[in-house]
């Protein structure tokens, strides 16, 4: 079969895996209130809002997911060096990362909540910890597995010159940054502040005054992930999937059109610049359209 067709197929599969990984990563962070909304949940008890959110301030998402995916990649790489089947190696590596993820989540939750118990009266709800841990580890496993699979395709099918653990580290940092900047805003700036008028942002005076009541009963992280699965999670997956697909596509296009190595690299760089400029222009037009369509925010 034509190597170019094989590369295109591997790229499409890698982009699909990255899309699933991005969605799962964002929903996992929503269950655990990590990154963007974490500081608001942290301030809740200080504002008199005793909550039942799972609050795991391990670190920012880029750092934590860089750790998880790199640990999974290093484990899988070592197992593949021992002639284990690549799929099994990726599964075992993702399982190791899930164990690390779960351990950090429990220690971060208990440490953060216990630190607020004495001064602000925030109880440590053990049922919250046990009920949220499964979705956190499960979504994390899916995200790490898909990212590690995409990294494996990048190294073995798309000709990436770097070793698997390093590519996995880069993918983990990238998806964490996208989840923190794209998907978590849907939770931290909207879901936690639904009692305030939409579009008003989060004034300093309102920080920590989070919603603690759901449509029925008391709100928790599982409610938040359900809400964010409608927009924030899919947007994160779409953003990460497009980054992986377009980045690989420009390299393949350079290999098809170019002759020598320098020409191929130059074509790939030019195509990448065209994609970035086109994206900037589209973002600007969408922003201007939205502002003209819905008008400025007022406090009426």
Curated annotation (Swiss-Prot):
Single GO molecular function: tetrahydromethanopterin S-methyltransferase activity
Record has Cell membrane as a keyword: yes
Location of the protein in the cell: Cell membrane
Main location: membrane
NCBIfam families named among the record's database cross-references: mtrE
Pathway assigned in UniProt: One-carbon metabolism; methanogenesis from CO(2); methyl-coenzyme M from 5,10-methylene-5,6,7,8-tetrahydromethanopterin: step 2/2
EC number, UniProt record: 7.2.1.4
Organism, scientific name: Methanococcus aeolicus (strain ATCC BAA-1280 / DSM 17508 / OCM 812 / Nankai-3)
Protein keywords: Cell membrane, Membrane, Methanogenesis, Methyltransferase, One-carbon metabolism, Transferase, Translocase, Transmembrane, Transmembrane helix
Bilayer topology term: Multi-pass membrane protein
A GO BP entry: methanogenesis, from carbon dioxide
Quaternary organization: The complex is composed of 8 subunits; MtrA, MtrB, MtrC, MtrD, MtrE, MtrF, MtrG and MtrH.
Enzyme class: translocase
Name listed for the protein in its UniProt record: Tetrahydromethanopterin S-methyltransferase subunit E
Task performed by this protein: Part of a complex that catalyzes the formation of methyl-coenzyme M and tetrahydromethanopterin from coenzyme M and methyl-tetrahydromethanopterin. This is an energy-conserving, sodium-ion translocating step.
Pfam families assigned to the protein according to its UniProt record, in alphabetical order: MtrE (PF04206)
